[in-house]
């Protein structure tokens, strides 16, 4: 099963993914993959990191000072996706009960290797929980085993409970 969480910027996608990760880990499931938290400097968003959930390794994904392909005002470090994110996701495919990818969006998709790896995950039997940028969603939601949830601040808790129910019904869970 693939659970994709989408919504407007600031709607709570990453918070939802984090709550689901905590729930699964609390139930004894192993979780791997990546998160991409923002980096703030002086109260302003300066960039984004990529963090390997299993090892805690981190690297700079994008910043206002990074050279590389641009997404808005951020330069993207494609190398960190290839060297840190892709191995983290591939390892999670082999070793973990659930893969977390937060987020599948324009910055992350600048890496061809990351795109290939996401396609592999989508074609696998592994449970995936991912935050997905709205514009990216259209190209990947056509698969039968994909469940898409739209998060907004008003119905965030209701969506969380629906996903928990779905996970409880998922026959691949222990």
UniProtKB/Swiss-Prot annotation:
Pfam families: NTPase_1. Has nucleotide phosphatase activity towards ATP, GTP, CTP, TTP and UTP. May hydrolyze nucleoside diphosphates with lower efficiency. Keywords: ATP-binding, Hydrolase, Nucleotide-binding. The lineage of its organism: Archaea, Methanobacteriati, Methanobacteriota, Methanomada group, Methanobacteria. GO terms for molecular function: ATP binding; ribonucleoside triphosphate phosphatase activity. Belongs to the THEP1 NTPase family. It comes from Methanothermobacter thermautotrophicus (strain ATCC 29096 / DSM 1053 / JCM 10044 / NBRC 100330 / Delta H). Its EC number is 3.6.1.15. PANTHER family: CANCER-RELATED NUCLEOSIDE-TRIPHOSPHATASE (PTHR43146:SF1). The keyword ATP-binding applies. InterPro entries: Nuc-triphosphatase_THEP1, P-loop_NTPase. SUPFAM superfamilies: P-loop containing nucleoside triphosphate hydrolases. It catalyses: a ribonucleoside 5'-triphosphate + H2O = a ribonucleoside 5'-diphosphate + phosphate + H(+). This is Nucleoside-triphosphatase THEP1. ATP binds at residues 7-14, 98-105.
């Amino acid at each position: 099963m693939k659970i994709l969480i989408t919504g407007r910027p600031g709607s709570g996608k990453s918070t939802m993914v984090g709550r689901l990760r905590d729930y699964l880990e609390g139930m004894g499931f192993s979780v791997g993959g990546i998160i991409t938290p923002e980096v703030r400097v002086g109260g302003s968003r300066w960039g984004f990191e990529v963090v390997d959930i299993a090892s805690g390794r981190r690297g700079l994904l994008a910043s206002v000072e990074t050279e590389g392909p641009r997404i808005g005002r951020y330069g993207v470090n494609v190398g960190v996706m290839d060297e840190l994110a892709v191995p983290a996701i591939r390892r999670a495919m082999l070793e973990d009960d659930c893969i977390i990818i937060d987020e599948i969006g324009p910055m992350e998709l600048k890496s061809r290797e990351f795109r290939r790896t996401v396609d592999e995950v989508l074609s696998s039997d592994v449970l995936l929980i991912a935050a997905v940028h709205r514009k990216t969603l259209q190209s990947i939601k056509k698969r039968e085993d994909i469940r898409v949830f739209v998060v907004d601040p008003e119905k965030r808790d209701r969506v969380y409970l629906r996903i928990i129910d779905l996970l409880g019904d998922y026959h691949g869970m222990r």
